[in-house]
Amino acid sequence: MALSRRRFLQATGSLSVLGAMGAAASVPYSQGEDCPRLVPPSGSVDCHMHLYDSRVPAAPGATLLPPDASLDDYRQLQRRLGLRRMVIVTPSTYGTDNRVMLEGLARSGTDARGIAVVASTVSDEELARLHGAGVRGIRFNLSTGGQALDGIELLAARVNELGWHVQLATGPLLADIAPRLAALPGKVVIDHMGHVPQPEGVLSPAFKALDGLMQQGRTWVKLSGPYLRSKTGAPHFEDVGLVARRLISHYPQRLLWGSDWPHPTQSLQNKPDDAALLDTLLDWAPDDQVRQLILRDNPVDLYGFA
């Protein structure tokens, strides 16, 4: 199949970046070459990653248009981190077109679950088809030009009957929408630690809203994307670490970890070191049993891994 001009430019740009990272760098869209110091428990899950394929057109108005990032690319990261299971999240790039995510599920068997984006008019038959493919939740993305919360209450009720949850990338809106989320039936998953702003951190209205949702007992939080809000930066993200530690100390049984690979909000020259991201858990959650909850037990329960 001939390369389109867009795909050719993406490929050559990616090769240039990989060359800048060093000839031995083997994982696309990830800095560094070392394996993490943290050895994940067997059966651990990367609860947040995306796949991109430019053969599937982007949705009108999409603001994130990353280069292709394939399942084979991601499997290189899995080998580096010592992981096998993952949750494939349809990104805002494709709107309600879940084909790239579904292809990833079909190729991954029981090692993967999916999070779909659906229209408020989605049919029961389509939801059943998605469930059979391995989808276990729907996502609303308010941070990068994704869809608004129109119809979230009705959709939440419908997917709750399937045992699914509602996942949200809230951007800066968490404090404003928390009352609506608190009233939803079923489980809610918040991406990227609620995008709690820094340097306000645990004193911010966003964190207070997040803490209130967690106190209800039906909300899960992904310890992912620390670079999105950190002012102190890599590798330790000390400011975001204060938010993570507070959550871990109070709600260890409803936390998840995700890589956010291929880090679509970050430029090709500024991708994080995924091994270092995983190693933040050594500082944030020094107890082995707590890390086992975050990396394996919690996601196995939430996503229904066997």
What are these regions (language model features)?
Residues A2-G22, V27-G43, D68, D72-R85, ...:
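Mid-to-C-terminal alpha-helical segments outside catalytic/metal-binding sites
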Residues V27-L162, P172, E238, A276:
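Mid-domain alpha/beta scaffold segments of enzyme catalytic cores
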Residues I88-V89, V117, K222, G258, ...:
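Short beta-strand segments
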Residues T93-Y94, S120-T121, T144-A148, V196-P199, ...:
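Short, small-residue-enriched loops and turns at beta-alpha junctions
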